[in-house]
Regions:
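Short, conserved alpha-helical segments within structured domains
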Residues: 1, 21, 60-63
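Thiotemplate assembly-line natural product biosynthesis machinery
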Residues: 1-18, 69-81
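Two-component histidine kinase catalytic core, primarily the HATPase_c
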Residues: 35
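C-terminal structural segments of small proteins and small subunits
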Residues: 54-56, 61-78
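Phosphopantetheine carrier-protein modules
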Residues: 10-30, 48-57, 81
Length: 81
């Protein structure tokens, strides 16, 4: 799942290396609120889910791990890839 998230993030913002662990994507300026909205659309399509608007919070997008946890809570399919 994390590899797929990194691929989506890299397509959205190719100028950043999302493979570095432990980064706060928001605080490092790697994604902003506009990116979060675009990311939600991509994640919904990729994982066959619908992320609830109340879950579009910076803490849910602060890291690849946080995004993965959000996907699991949202019922993401095929979470092992």
């Amino acid at each position: 799942m994390k590899e797929r998230i990194i691929k989506i993030l890299s397509e959205l913002r190719p100028e950043f290396d999302f493979t570095v662990e432990g980064l706060d994507l928001i605080e490092e300026g790697m994604i902003d609120s506009f990116d979060m909205v675009s990311l939600v659309n991509e994640l919904d399509t990729e994982f066959g889910i619908s992320i609830d608007g109340v879950d579009i919070l910076p803490e849910n997008f602060a890291s690849v791990e946080a995004i993965a946890n959000l996907l699991i809570r949202s019922g993401a399919k095929d979470v092992t890839k």
